[in-house]
Amino acid sequence: MSKRLLLFDFDETYFKHNTNEEDLSHLREMEKLLEKLTNNNEVITAVLTGSTFQSVMDKMDQVNMTFKPLHIFSDLSSKMFTWNNGEYVESETYKKKVLSEPFLFEDIEDILRHISAQYNVEFIPQRAFEGNETHYNFYFHSTGNHNNDSRILEALVRYANDQNYTARFSRSNPLAGDPENAYDIDFTPSNAGKLYATQFLMRKYNIPVKSILGFGDSGNDEAYLSYLEHAYLMSNSRDEALKQKFRLTKYPYYQGITLHVKEFVEGKYDY
């Protein structure tokens, strides 16, 4: 039997913020299933997230997660970490591919200043940036008019592209700690992002798209979920537009993942 690839967004997908006592039994059931499938050499697991690697580790510790996904692609999949001999190790191969083109914070600041001046708006850093980052993320608070928001953000993406930079935007998720009525603005190298990470794993393990199952809950999952034949938006998602586009999990969070992973590996989605 050929291996299957299981891909998970992290915040509000693989990890529920505000996990309570009732959720823990469902979490343990999910981990038990993933551990069994991994030990039986049936699946490869990977987390694709916009969060930093340390943030993922801290959140896993909060709920005492014991299962270790083989790969964690952090910082909007601009960094790759692999579980090896009891610890996560960053992939130098992936890093070289990501940093094959210039990616400078000074250039990104210039791009944001240009759009800020043109539309009289502000972009707020989401965290303190360090040197040589591969992911710079900002908040943009809604103007109160969706069409106006889209006009500004699409202008940002176009202008960034003109400067040979990749910018993405999606609705912020308050359940994951984001502010209400805001957008995430993400800058990454061109060789990064959840879709890029997905295709990297497909090549690495020679896995066809029909053998991949993906889960997500928000706008930065849209591109990679759209690429897959077997993709689920979490039923707990707050993105109403995406709910119209993707199949929803039967249950939220851990229960939903467990059910659909079981069905997937049992061949119920094969055709």
From Swiss-Prot:
Keywords carried by this UniProt record: Hydrolase
Record-annotated disulphide pairs: none
Pfam family, one: S6PP
SUPFAM superfamilies documented for this protein: HAD-like (SSF56784)
A GO term, aspect molecular function: phosphatase activity
EC number: 3.-.-.-
Protein's UniProt keywords contain Hydrolase: yes
Enzyme class, broadest EC rank: hydrolase
Cellular compartments per GO CC: cytosol
Segments crossing the lipid bilayer: none
InterPro entries per the UniProt record, alphabetical: HAD-like_sf, HAD-SF_hydro_IIB, HAD_sf, SPP-like_dom
Top-level taxon of the source organism: Bacteria
Family, similarity comment: Belongs to the HAD-like hydrolase superfamily.
Listed name of the protein: Uncharacterized hydrolase SAOUHSC_02465
